[in-house]
Amino acid sequence: MKKAIYFLALTISLGVSAQDSDYSVSSYLDEGFKAPNTHYIGEAWLNRLLQADDDLTYNITKATFKENSTLDWHKHGTVQVLIVIAGTGYYQEKGKEPVLMEAGDIIKCEKNTEHWHSSSKQSDVTYLALYGGEKPTIWTEVLTQEYYDSVFKKLVK
C-alpha cells in the first residue's frame, strides 16, 4: 500500500512539474472556448490541442457539442478521424443512413466526403477530431432543425 501511495504521489508531482516546465504541454481536459454560432445550431466548445506546422501535418481539436446541437453539412480536403470520448451523437455521410456515435467509437471520414456530426438530442458529445494541414473546412449545406429532428426519430426507438 505504501508503494502505491508513493507511486501516485510521484506521478502527480511529475505531471505538475511537466506542466510548469519548458515542454509544450496542454490538456484535452480543458473545455476550450465557446465557438461562434457559425455553421451549426446549438452550443459548441472547441479546444485546439495541436496545430499543423512544418513538422506536424495534422491538427487535433477537442469538440464538445451540448445536447441538441449540430454542425452543417461539410467536407474536408483531407481524411478526418473522429474519436468519441464522451456522450452520444449522430454522424452521417451524404447518401448514407445516419448512425449513432458513442464514447469509444472511431470514425474515419475520407477526404472530400460530405458529412455532418453532432450531439444527440438527449446527450452532449465530446470527440477528438484529427484532420490534415491548413486546408479549411468546406461548408456545403445548412443542416436544418427539422432534418436533425427526423434523424433523432429514426435513431431513437
Task: Go through each PLM region and give its residues.
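Short acidic-glycine-tyrosine-enriched beta hairpin
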Residues: 95-112
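Conserved short histidine dyad/triad with adjacent acidic residue
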Residues: 59-76
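Ligand-binding loop in jelly-roll beta-barrel domains
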Residues: 90, 111-137
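Glycine- and acidic-residue-biased ligand/ion/polar-headgroup-sensing regions
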Residues: 77-90, 94-95
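A short, N-terminal "cap"/entry segment at the start of jelly-roll beta-barrel domains
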Residues: 18-57, 137-157
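Bacterial Sec-dependent N-terminal signal peptides
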Residues: 1-21
